[in-house]
Curated annotation (Swiss-Prot):
It comes from Nitrosomonas europaea (strain ATCC 19718 / CIP 103999 / KCTC 2705 / NBRC 14298). NCBIfam families: ruvC. Homodimer which binds Holliday junction (HJ) DNA. The HJ becomes 2-fold symmetrical on binding to RuvC with unstacked arms; it has a different conformation from HJ DNA in complex with RuvA. In the full resolvosome a probable DNA-RuvA(4)-RuvB(12)-RuvC(2) complex forms which resolves the HJ. InterPro entries: RNaseH-like_sf (IPR012337), RNaseH_sf (IPR036397), X-over_junc_endoDNase_Mg_BS (IPR020563), X-over_junc_endoDNase_RuvC (IPR002176). This is Crossover junction endodeoxyribonuclease RuvC.
Length: 181
């Protein structure tokens, strides 16, 4: 009698934490209920002008996509900063990151920082160090990843778990509010 062995096929997710100076990336693969760390790092743009920085982000993420072949991309949404110019610049970096994914016809999913932190740490207002620590533990890493890479990995983890946490809480809160009205 011959037994067949099937390799478990997971879904590979690229998480992106966009930034004009440093864009973090992290790749995880979800196989069943298990997460496997594939890689992470940062695309650093330097001090060049805006168009060159955006091109560096696009080219860097394009290379990562070609190398690691993710199937889905999870990107952190832009938060509204006190300085509107900073928010607009961050939005442009985010646009370059999303463009890299779209060029490869990948599905792009967006999560707020609160959603990501809630899903990974259990607290939507967690500090950077807490996110780094939980990412390290969840993925079995030997050391904490850099903050930007940790945020990107956290975004990928959030997506791998269906964006649970704040999304579920928000739905519950909406139904409570609608009952009160």
């Amino acid at each position: 009698m011959t037994s067949l062995v099937y390799a478990a096929k997971g879904i590979r997710i690229l998480g992106i934490d966009p930034g004009l100076r440093i864009t973090g990336f992290g790749i995880v693969e979800k196989i069943g209920n298990r997460l496997v760390y594939i890689g992470s790092g940062c695309v650093v743009t330097g001090e060049s002008g805006l168009p060159d920085r955006l091109k560096t982000i696009l080219d860097g993420l394009n290379e990562i996509i070609l190398q690691h072949k993710p199937e889905q991309v999870a990107v952190e949404q832009v938060f509204v900063n006190i300085n509107p110019k900073s928010t607009l610049l961050l939005g442009q970096a985010r646009g370059a990151a999303i463009s890299a994914a779209v060029l490869h016809e990948l599905s792009v999913y967006e999560y707020t920082a609160l959603q990501v932190k809630q899903a990974v740490v259990g607290n939507g207002h967690a500090r950077k160090e807490q996110v780094q620590e939980m990412v390290m533990r969840l993925l079995g890493l030997g050391e904490r990843p850099r903050p930007d890479a940790a945020d990107a990995l956290a975004c990928a983890i959030c997506h791998a778990h269906g964006g649970t946490g704040l999304l579920t809480l928000s739905a519950r809160n909406r139904s409570k509010r609608s009952k009160r009205l």
